[in-house]
């Protein structure tokens, strides 16, 4: 799913003051890097699931009924027919709606509505799939900005690849994977809140 997040790019001068705010765009090279990253993350998660070892997975569950009701109401108000009040849509169906409103006056409001409809992705020690990416296995094995979950699963995979058997891996990392997942999910929320506050301060300065 390709939902426009409305992310902005802040332009700062030499003294760190905000002198411009622009809509963030990504080029072809960045899209290629993202594809490589997604493939690496998917392969790492699949490897861990097949080996049945403790791991830190990135989990994104499907939208809940209450959020789908709100999205349904929004789409109806925009004259778009859907069945989302009765059953969970597939990411392909949501993507088709996004494509249908692209370039229309409804594009921004529909994008925002879909973003709010989505469940919050979290870290968990058990694989539950990634709804938005339509993947059975996913983890944050690599990323442009290094995350603790990346380092946690590097540690686990290094141990396994060095020959540690499955039973020892389970004893050594079951508790670790659970705690790392919980703490990483909690700290991610705090980091996002701080990031948004900082961004708001720069926007206000501009």
Give the location of each predicted region:
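Electropositive polyanion-binding surfaces
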Residues: 1-206
